[in-house]
Design a protein with these regions (language model features):
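Conserved catalytic-loop position in the HRD/HxD motif
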Residues: 20, 25-27
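Conserved helicase/translocase P-loop NTPase motor core
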Residues: 3-19
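Short amphipathic alpha-helical surface micro-motifs
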Residues: 14, 22, 124-125
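Helix-rich C-lobe and terminal helical cap/extension of kinase-like folds
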Residues: 1-7, 34-180
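Hydrophobic residue at the +6 position relative to the catalytic HRD Asp in the kinase catalytic loop
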Residues: 29-33
């Protein structure tokens, strides 16, 4: 399960950031898992992530990792999750939520998916804010979040022990290096 989990994670990262072609429905019936390979069976829900989206999403992830609130606000606005009208309290809560969800995957080492239920964190956040009349994030963000959650759920069920940071850092470096 660790080796298949690593392959699935590597495939996911490559699709998200290098090709920009993302499978939007990563449930079990859409993959065939064999001893030494993963075969994608269903191509009916493939989404193209724009170059601008990928740049902004990576900037957003880097802002979380570097605890850079200025960059977080900049990229959050570009992704449609933050606006210029958001007050400091909302920004602080939003940053705390994003940090709770993403920063465990920035730790060095090999370990299983670190969160029991990331949706619980989101539910707690949403309970404390007024949603009526608020903005909506871009569709690409919803697509990548859904795919991340599907991957996370699969790897959690397998209890795959992975190096989360190393492969992600290599893929993000490759993406950024290809921009030069």
């Amino acid at each position: 399960k660790n080796e298949m989990g690593r392959k699935l994670y590597d495939f996911h990262l490559h699709c998200c950031y290098i090709t920009g072609l993302l499978h939007g429905d990563p449930q079990n019936g859409n993959y065939l898992f064999k001893r030494d390979q993963i075969i994608l069976l269903d191509f009916g829900n493939i989404h193209k992530l724009s170059l601008d989206f990928r740049k902004n999403y990576i900037g957003f992830l880097r802002a979380i990792e570097n605890v850079d609130m200025t960059a977080y606000q900049f990229y959050g606005k570009n992704l449609g999750v933050l606006t210029t009208e958001d007050d400091q309290e909302f920004l602080a809560k939003h940053f705390a939520l994003a940090t709770a969800i993403f920063s465990p995957f920035d730790q060095v080492g090999i370990f299983p998916p670190p969160l029991d239920n990331p949706l619980h964190l989101i539910h707690q956040f949403v309970k404390g804010i007024k949603l009526k009349g608020t903005h909506r994030p871009c569709g690409e963000l919803a697509t990548i979040d859904r795919t991340h959650l599907g991957l996370y759920t699969k790897l959690r069920a397998w209890n795959s022990h992975l190096d989360w940071k190393g492969p992600k850092d290599r893929i993000l470096w490759e993406f950024e290096n290809n921009l030069k």
